[in-house]
Amino acid sequence: MATTATHPDGSALGDLPKPRFNKEGLGYTKDFDLAFVKEMFDALQAERVKLTGQAKRLEDEAHQLVEEAEMGDVQFDDEGGEGDTMIVERERDLALSAQAREAVVEIDEALDRIKRGTYGYSVMSGRPVPRERLEAIPWATVLVEEKVGGIGRR
């Protein structure tokens, strides 16, 4: 019996191979064997830890910049330019932190797909995502040719 995949909008994509599950609850299929899925699971977990830490550090740096500005260490006159630099650095840190947190959400979704036995299959077509793509971006959700328009991490 196959698993029916659904598009993010809820429409059916078609049948995926029926997954099997190991004792840890990792789902694998004929296209993505247990060894590969475990390797990707471990890579996703490691990347999640790294990005969560990175997001926290960047937020801490942004808050520290605000605290330093409030303590009066920053000149806000036209000659110094320090105030503008601090604002730019703070905004950059917050933007990078938000990107890291967004990637963590995508990683969590990939980990969920592993537990459902649908990892490695396009959320758009249900076709297998090439292993090389998953090795490069373990949280990838679509095939390269399906990713039309826009720049993204998937």
Predicted feature residues:
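Short Cys/His-rich "knuckle" micro-motifs
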Residues: 132-137
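Short cysteine-rich clusters marking metal-coordination/redox-active sites
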Residues: 122-126, 143
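Short functional micro-motifs and their immediate structural scaffolds
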Residues: 112, 128-130, 151
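Interaction interfaces in information-processing and related assembly proteins
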Residues: 1-113, 153-154
